[in-house]
């Protein structure tokens, strides 16, 4: 690092002896702040997604206080500010609808204010990519502090995983093996503390992605939300944010193509969520890194899944932390030369390899397995292409049934999610265990927002027969806590005129994960005729933000960002407001 200290952005607010400097400093002082507290010091923004409507992030006020202490100790001045909290737990129709909105909030808050560096307080699923996208668009020094996973769920003396147990028990109710009272009894034991889902769902996956990308300190991903060490990490992150400003360590030096390759490999090792495919693409787009689905095949396929966590495995995030967390996984990969780019820089100024080469691994290789004893030998995201998904689709092998990953079945078609709900449990539905459930119009434009409805629950009559999985295909997403042989993110989506819109009841579809093929088994001429007969999707005139979303959202293979947000716009100081 250079010994020369960079010019502070905040000096263009507070460092001038003129009318503008007078006003900016004076307004800060109305909070009881003295000159020496902020004048000439790095101003560190604390970007907080706390909200009582986002239970996962309910403890962020306390975390922010510890970040502030770290900033002050390192000689900086902290300023906390709120941004849109797009938590998954309560927000309808889907938090994905507002991920880009939240990123715009973050970007404009950073650029328009006297902020030299920023600590991003993220937690629930979409908050991590949203804040990273916004910060990347500005390319300022930034460090991620996630809220951590909640405590293990407990029910009838056993551990239960948040999210995952909902899918399990709801299917058991439909199958008639438990009562609705049994189902509801588990409700109070699933979420026992603040924090994100305690499975390897999207929140934990994206926390691991942030750590693998190098944008958070080691162990950030797995420390439980209510563990005191979470506060210690927050304090250290505040200190480090000040040092990053002095070193001019911007996100563009960390979020390189090499960093994204590391994250893709890690996603395979941990059995991470398919949502990471969309989010990493969107983050990469904001910092100017080219990333596409072929990178997931090139880097991820063939990588064993060695983290034995639900929904792919047995354990929960508490056990993952006690076993050594992500640094232990990275050490295991590093010792086998499986980290693509161990020299990638991280926020603490060290490389990913340096941070993890001596990381301890605990627990007799149960939670974090050895590479020769994985839970799935080929756990990387499976990218599928074919006449049904010309721009691609994805499937998560670690959560799928191996016997179904090469399958040919007859399509049972639902034109939308409402039709699926209306028909799926109809005793007269023409479906058997070898059928393929196909759902349309659940993509970015069609839902809108690409909701997590792709893991369609199975027909009640098949559940009663003991069927536990079927091939399912849609242009939707699914929760990272879900499981099954589920083909997702079909692009182009049905609402954008993709071939998925042409599938008819009774068509035969072939899925071959080994070759990455998803094929609608009809003659090319027939498919061309169907495509020609497609009626242009009816333009939804909903107005407001949703109208903007529908008109500007990109397809899943492009990360579902807005077309006008792709690219890094930097943090050039705007003109004065007075």
Feature-to-residue mapping (PLM):
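Catalytic or ion-coupling anion/metal-binding cores of large enzyme and transporter domains
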Residues: 2-52, 56-58, 63-83, 89, ...
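Short coil/turn segments at secondary-structure boundaries
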Residues: 54-58, 90-98, 118, 123
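Glycine-rich, N-terminal phosphate-binding loop and its surrounding beta-alpha-beta segment
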Residues: 71, 105-109, 118
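N-terminal small/polar loop signature for handling phosphorylated ligands or for N-terminal nucleophile
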Residues: 80-113
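A short, small-residue-rich loop immediately preceding and capping a beta-strand
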Residues: 110-131, 142-146
């Amino acid at each position: 690092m250079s010994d020369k200290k960079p010019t502070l952005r905040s000096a263009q607010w507070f460092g001038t002896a003129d009318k503008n400097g007078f006003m900016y400093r004076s307004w800060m002082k109305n909070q009881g702040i003295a000159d020496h507290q902020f004048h000439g010091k790095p101003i560190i923004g604390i970007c907080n997604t706390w909200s009582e409507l986002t239970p996962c992030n309910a403890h962020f006020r306390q975390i922010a206080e510890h970040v502030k202490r770290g900033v002050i100790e390192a000689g900086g001045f902290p300023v906390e500010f709120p941004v849109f909290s797009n938590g998954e737990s309560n927000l309808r129709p889907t938090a994905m609808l507002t991920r880009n909105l939240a990123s715009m909030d973050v970007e404009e808050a950073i650029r328009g204010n006297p902020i030299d560096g920023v600590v991003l307080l993220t937690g629930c699923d979409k908050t991590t990519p949203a804040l990273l996208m916004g910060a990347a668009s500005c390319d300022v020094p930034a460090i991620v502090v996630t809220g951590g996973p909640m405590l293990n769920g407990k029910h009838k003396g056993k551990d239960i995983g948040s999210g995952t147990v909902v899918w399990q028990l709801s299917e058991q109710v439909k199958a008639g093996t438990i009562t609705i009272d049994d189902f509801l009894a588990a409700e109070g034991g699933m979420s026992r503390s603040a924090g994100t889902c305690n499975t390897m769902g999207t929140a934990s996956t994206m926390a691991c992605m942030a750590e693998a990308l190098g944008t958070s300190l080691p162990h950030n991903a797995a420390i439980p939300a209510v563990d005191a060490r979470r506060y210690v990490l927050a304090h250290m992150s505040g200190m480090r944010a000040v040092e990053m400003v002095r070193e001019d360590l911007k996100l563009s030096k960390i979020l390189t193509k090499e960093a994204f390759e590391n994250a893709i490999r890690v996603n395979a090792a941990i059995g991470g969520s398919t949502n990471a495919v969309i989010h990493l693409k969107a983050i990469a787009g904001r910092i100017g890194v080219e990333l596409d689905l072929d990178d997931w095949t090139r880097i991820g396929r063939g990588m064993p899944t060695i983290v034995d966590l639900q929904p792919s495995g047995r354990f929960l995030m508490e056990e993952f932390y006690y076993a050594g967390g992500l640094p232990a996984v990275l050490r295991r990969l590093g010792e086998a030369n499986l980290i693509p780019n161990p020299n990638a820089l991280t926020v603490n100024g060290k490389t990913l390899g340096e941070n993890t080469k001596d990381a301890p691994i605990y627990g007799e290789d149960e939670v974090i397995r050895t590479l020769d004893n994985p839970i799935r030998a080929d756990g990387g995201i499976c990218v599928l292409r074919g006449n049904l998904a010309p721009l691609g689709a994805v499937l998560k092998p670690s959560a799928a049934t191996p016997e179904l990953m090469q399958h040919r079945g007859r399509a049972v078609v639902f034109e939308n999610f409402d039709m699926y709900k209306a028909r799926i449990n109809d005793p007269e539905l023409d479906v058997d265990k070898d059928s393929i459930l196909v759902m349309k119009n659940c993509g970015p434009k069609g839902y809108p927002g690409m909701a997590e409805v792709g893991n369609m629950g199975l027909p009640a009559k098949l559940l009663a027969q003991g069927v536990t999985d079927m091939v399912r295909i849609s242009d939707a997403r699914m929760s990272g806590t879900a499981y099954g042989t589920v083909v997702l993110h079909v692009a182009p989506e049905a609402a954008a005129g993709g071939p998925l819109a042409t599938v008819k009841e009774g068509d035969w579809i072939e899925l071959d994960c080994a070759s990455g093929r998803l094929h609608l088994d009809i003659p090319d001429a027939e498919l061309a005729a169907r495509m020609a007969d497609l009626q242009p999707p009816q333009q939804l005139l909903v107005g407001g933000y949703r109208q903007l979303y529908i008109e500007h959202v990109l397809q899943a293979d492009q990360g579902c960002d807005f077309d006008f947000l792709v690219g890094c716009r930097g943090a050039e100081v705007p003109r004065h407001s007075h």
